[in-house]
Curated annotation (Swiss-Prot):
It comes from Shewanella amazonensis (strain ATCC BAA-1098 / SB2B). Pfam families: Rnf-Nqr. It is a multi-pass membrane protein. This is Ion-translocating oxidoreductase complex subunit E. The complex is composed of six subunits: RnfA, RnfB, RnfC, RnfD, RnfE and RnfG. The keyword Magnesium does not apply. It is found in: Cell inner membrane. The gene is rnfE. It comes from the Bacteria. InterPro entries: NqrDE/RnfAE, RnfE. Keywords: Cell inner membrane, Cell membrane, Electron transport, Membrane, Translocase, Transmembrane, Transmembrane helix, Transport.
Amino acid sequence: MSNYKEIAWQGLWKNNPGLVQLLGLCPLLAVTATLTNALGLGLATVAVLIGSNVLVSLVREFVPKEIRIPVFVMIIAALVTVVQLVINAYAYGLYLSLGIFLPLIVTNCVIIGRAEAFASRNSVGAAAFDGLMMGTGFTAVLAVLGAVREILGQGTLFDGADQLLGDWAASLRIELWHVDNSFLLAMLPPGAFIAMGLLIAGKNVIDKRLEAKKPTPEAAPAITRARITKVG
């Protein structure tokens, strides 16, 4: 159980793919203009991460080390194709919004990195849980970044939620304030870089405060040595 707790802690916070490893920055910065797009890409990434970790863990004993990377990439590409077809069939609006970044999940270093560093060395259960935690941590960063950019840029939240969840989700849209013109800096890549930097800085501040609260180990008492100068 403690091993699974460590996997969760690593994926959600300590070794978060977005805030610590800084992997997958291209889609992370390009697709997070709205919370809906961020959640859509995040959920797709979670599905591929779990599936690829499970399959890699299952075939790890049968794949020669010399060709393991091409095999892992083929597994990931097959799963991304399945996810892409599912989104195309059931969430076509989201499929159009994500565009090229959906098939580019194949090249996401988070996925191939976990397949190589963890799934190929651990059991199926641990690999699946690692994929879930790493994917959830990555999705959380996407969601926070998407929410911040959407609020600052458009004054809304969950705009276009019907593209992800269906027609009923159109009622989830929240207009926090009315803006005649969008705040372009928040919607464009420079704003995404600034927001990402602030998120990383915030995490570092929290980590330092948590580290400062840890009790410092007490120093061992010094050993005093008595010097004998006279015998008898």
